[in-house]
Amino acid sequence: MRVFTTFLAMLLFGCAVVAADSPRASFMGVGAIRIGMTADELSTALGRSVAPEPPDEAGCFYIPGDSAASFSVMVQDGRVVRIDVDSPSIPTLRGARVGDKVDAVRKLYGAALKEEPHFYAGLPGLYLTYFSSDRRFALRFETHEGVVSTYYLGYAEPTQYVEGCL
């Protein structure tokens, strides 16, 4: 029994370490990627060149944030303005993640969460938006069939673009 208990404790401790090492999303960014940083600062943070494809799309473009494609970074007018998270591997500071049920997000963010029907799918698809106290930043969850399918964070206006770059 002692061996089983020790094994279980090691397994749980190992899981906790993995969870603690994963980046978390806030109004201000994910890991080393910060809202408001320049494209050059983003290049340094990512360890690779940041350039739009095709080059004439420099006004607004997306860059993969990591090799696992768990998030992407929107650069508009030379600055990071929004980050789109598509993987459950990156939770918010409150613990919400892709794959969570709408009710779980409501419970985490409470009455401050603004709910709107999804632009394309309508109800039951929703946008659940949580604003910073000064309303400069937002965290927006996009849902499909009662489950978070993606979420965005960053400056309030770009987080509400339904098409990403305009």
Predicted regions and their residues:
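Generic hydrophobic-segment detector
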Residues: F4-T6, S26, V85, S89, ...
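Bacterial N-terminal signal peptides
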Residues: T5-G14
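A cross-family detector of function-defining hotspots
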Residues: A20-P23, M37-R79, D86, R97-E163
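Second-shell loop/turn segments in exported
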Residues: S26-I33, S89-A96
